[in-house]
């Protein structure tokens, strides 16, 4: 009797399991041309695993990078290793970190330059208030580049 009870309980646990509903999320592409990868996530590098996706830009610097969905700019950085970096939080719960950019768009570009002169330092970090720099899906947020520790435009 006990064996049947345990078997029935185990079957009920396996069949009736339901965690959470999968969200249906859509994104717009970050570029207005066909996407081709030049670097994959998890790819083995000389001293680490690659932590992102790199998209080819045809060897061109300065192509518009677009927001994938509605959201806001959550962090702005200029670093020696990653160059110009823009973090975006999207209202759908996802986020992106855009590295190696050639530049930012207005008004972020002006704010970064002002802070660089004030600090007399090329490396800066700005953490804006949530919603201070809102973005819409498809909006130009930066320019593709080759800054920092990068081996070609992407």
Question: Positions of the model-derived regions?
Answer:
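Conserved beta3 VAIK motif of the Hanks protein kinase fold
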Residues: 98
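Surface-exposed, glycine-biased beta-strand/turn segments
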Residues: 19-94, 102-107, 122-123, 129-131, ...
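A solvent-exposed, charged loop/short amphipathic helix patch at secondary-structure junctions
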Residues: 111-123
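Bacterial Sec-dependent N-terminal signal peptides
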Residues: 1-25
């Amino acid at each position: 009797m006990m064996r049947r009870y345990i078997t029935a309980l185990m079957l009920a646990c396996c069949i009736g399991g339901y965690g959470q509903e999968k969200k249906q999320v859509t994104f717009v592409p970050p570029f207005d041309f066909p996407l081709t990868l030049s670097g994959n996530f998890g790819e083995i590098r000389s001293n680490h695993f690659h932590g992102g996706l790199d998209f080819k830009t045809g060897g061109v610097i300065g192509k518009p990078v677009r927001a994938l969905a509605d959201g806001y700019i959550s962090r702005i950085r200029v670093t020696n290793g990653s160059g110009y970096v823009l973090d975006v939080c999207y209202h759908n719960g996802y986020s992106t970190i855009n590295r190696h950019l050639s530049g930012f768009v207005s008004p972020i570009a002006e704010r970064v330059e002002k802070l660089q002169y004030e600090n007399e330092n090329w490396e800066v970090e700005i953490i804006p208030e949530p919603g201070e720099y809102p973005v819409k899906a498809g909006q130009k947020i930066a320019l593709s580049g080759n800054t920092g520790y990068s081996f070609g435009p992407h």
